[in-house]
């Protein structure tokens, strides 16, 4: 990993009170595994947890602050420290599952009153406690490993502890609390105190820091031979495939059926089997050699759908027993009418350079066949799996893919090293429903003119070097200015579309410059050079690193002991009221 990547990573870990815009911009940067230091979740209030009123009864406060709750390795955690992990674990879970959390449990009811497992009687409070225990083992196993290895926090990481205290004071005042301890209590409950919270944060930070350092160092040890060995006999897993596809559901071929009082149509097994047979026949008729081009296959699909449409009309007329008096007005249709009618028919989907892991599983074996050649076409069944009353697995045909192979690539091409100067759009209005900021043509034009002016001044100066561009970026870019706008080892799909397409244009070469527009603004681009790392090696290395880190981390976790001494002070009456 480059020095610039490491610096960006440190910024991501340590930047306190990070704004939503900053977070969105940093999604473009490469990241190692992120151990979420959930203080940030709390600080920006991503998830609202209504915990009721925390009574500050002196006895209860003392008990929570000093009761021995957990022993993990050689560490004794007090009840309040357990609560820090507990509340943050819940916050993370709710934040991660916010789109469907209200379908998982009642967010307006205490978690301790909601059974999550009818067989064991476990509640959601029990489940969250189990998740918390896992997080504690994870954190302390890494922390102990860090201490044993002599790992220390970087200067920036050390500064984040001071920044944390400052921000806690700011938020305490902002939300009307008399002091920082009162603010922490409103989040974590009785016994919360700045000293114990800072200890919790520092241990979590140390665990994160060491994980990332170990990961970086391990990745540096990988050789090309090690990567080829890791690929083993499955090199296709890192290839990408270009193909056309068309999916047909069995529902299109169902006929007959009986409509119930609720309006739903049910089919006999004979009718369902007839539909499956018709689907199979239609798919096989589409998947013939003469249909292996886009136009030919689209025409065949249209003809099939017209046939199905006519059959449906005939069936409906038979059921209604009424005479169809509709006049054929085909000759009266204008060209626009005909074009509009064409839109109602299905067409093939063109899929370009799709990674093997993103292919529909039923297509993978056929597409990866090394004997596959351009224009090959086939029909591939899609089945659902269920269990019958005797416990036997039953497969049922639900659809068919018609697939046309076009090409594949082993992704053995270089990643990109690029510098850029971002001239962002200014102004704009935020859509209240989507949260997306939109800019007027005038606002976009202003950014474009500013970028073009700066670009022209640089070119007119006549020193068109990387160094001169880097200096210009340091003075003018609104992104990564400290590093002269440098991004190294960019892989396809990492950056926004127009930025990505410029970087990976087949004609791109060192020294190329230009301006591209993205949703962020206008980027003045300077192509530094091809990276020494190929996209393929980047993917293989990432996959190997993930597996190696999981193995290493599991070993640490398995080696550390944990005893639940007294966990009764967790808040089982917590209400997750996220406003969904």
Question: What do these predicted regions represent?
Answer:
Residues 281-364, 450-498, 528:
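Peptidyl-prolyl cis-trans isomerase
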Residues 59-195, 267:
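N-terminal targeting/tethering segments
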Residues 156-158, 483-484, 570:
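Residue-level detector of family-conserved "landmark" positions at structurally sensitive sites
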Residues 86, 93, 136, 140, ...:
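Sec/Tat-exported extracytoplasmic proteins
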Residues 6-12, 131, 136, 141, ...:
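An exposure/low-complexity boundary signal
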Residues 9-41, 45-65, 183-277, 281-284, ...:
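PPIase-associated folding chaperone regions across multiple families
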Residues 91-103, 250-261, 312-321, 426-432:
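Internal, charge-rich low-complexity segments
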């Amino acid at each position: 990993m480059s020095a610039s990547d490491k610096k960006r990573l440190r910024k991501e870990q340590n930047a306190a009170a990070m704004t939503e815009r900053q977070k969105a911009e940093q999604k473009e940067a490469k990241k190692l595994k992120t151990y979420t230091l959930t203080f940030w979740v709390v600080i920006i209030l991503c998830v609202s947890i209504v915990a009721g009123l925390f009574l500050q009864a002196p006895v209860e406060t003392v008990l929570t602050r000093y009761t021995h709750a957990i022993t993990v390795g050689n560490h004794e955690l007090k009840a309040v420290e357990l609560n820090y992990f507990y509340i943050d674990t819940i916050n993370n879970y709710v934040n991660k599952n916010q789109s469907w959390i209200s379908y998982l449990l009642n967010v307006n009811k205490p978690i301790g009153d909601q059974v999550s497992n009818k067989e064991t009687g476990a509640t959601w409070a029990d489940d969250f406690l189990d998740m918390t225990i896992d997080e504690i083992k994870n954190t302390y196993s890494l922390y102990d490993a860090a201490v044993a290895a002599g790992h220390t926090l970087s200067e920036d990481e050390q500064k984040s502890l001071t920044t944390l205290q400052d921000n806690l004071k700011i938020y305490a005042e902002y939300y009307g609390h008399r002091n920082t301890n009162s603010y922490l209590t409103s989040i974590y409950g009785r016994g919360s105190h700045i000293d114990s919270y800072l200890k919790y944060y520092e241990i979590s930070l140390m665990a994160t820091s060491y994980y990332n350092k170990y990961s970086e160092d391990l990745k540096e040890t990988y050789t090309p031979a090690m990567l080829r060995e890791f690929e083993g006999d499955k090199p296709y897993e890192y290839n990408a495939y270009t193909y056309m596809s068309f999916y047909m559901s069995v529902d299109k071929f169902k006929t007959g059926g009986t409509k119930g009082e609720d309006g739903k149509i049910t089919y006999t097994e004979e009718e369902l089997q007839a539909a499956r047979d018709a689907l199979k026949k239609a798919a096989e008729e589409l998947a013939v050699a003469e249909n292996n081009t886009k136009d030919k296959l689209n025409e065949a699909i249209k003809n099939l759908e017209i046939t199905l449409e006519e059959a449906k009309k005939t069936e409906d007329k038979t059921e209604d027993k009424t005479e169809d008096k509709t006049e054929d007005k085909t000759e009266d249709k204008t060209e626009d009418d005909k074009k509009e009618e064409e839109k109602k028919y299905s067409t093939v989907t063109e899929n370009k350079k799709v990674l093997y892991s993103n292919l529909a599983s039923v297509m993978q074996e056929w597409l990866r066949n090394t004997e596959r050649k351009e224009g090959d076409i086939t029909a591939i069944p899609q089945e659902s799996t269920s269990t019958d009353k005797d416990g036997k697995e039953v497969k049922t045909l639900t659809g068919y893919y018609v697939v046309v192979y076009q090409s594949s690539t082993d992704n053995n091409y270089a990643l990109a090293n690029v510098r850029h100067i971002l001239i962002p759009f200014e102004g704009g209005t935020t859509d209240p429903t989507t949260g997306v900021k939109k800019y007027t043509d005038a606002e976009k034009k202003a950014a474009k003119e500013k970028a073009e002016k700066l670009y022209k001044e640089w070119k007119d100066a006549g020193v068109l070097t990387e160094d001169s561009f880097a200096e210009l970026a340091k003075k003018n870019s609104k992104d990564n200015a400290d590093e002269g706008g440098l991004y190294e080892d960019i892989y396809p799909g990492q950056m926004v579309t127009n930025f990505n397409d410029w970087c990976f244009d087949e004609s791109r070469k060192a020294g190329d410059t230009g301006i591209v527009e993205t949703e962020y603004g206008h980027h003045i681009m300077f192509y530094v050079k091809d990276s020494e790392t190929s996209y393929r090696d980047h993917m293989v290395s990432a996959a190997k690193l993930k597996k190696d880190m999981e193995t290493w981390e599991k070993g640490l976790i398995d080696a550390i002991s944990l005893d639940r001494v007294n966990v009764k002070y967790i808040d089982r009456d917590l209400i997750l009221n996220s406003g969904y």
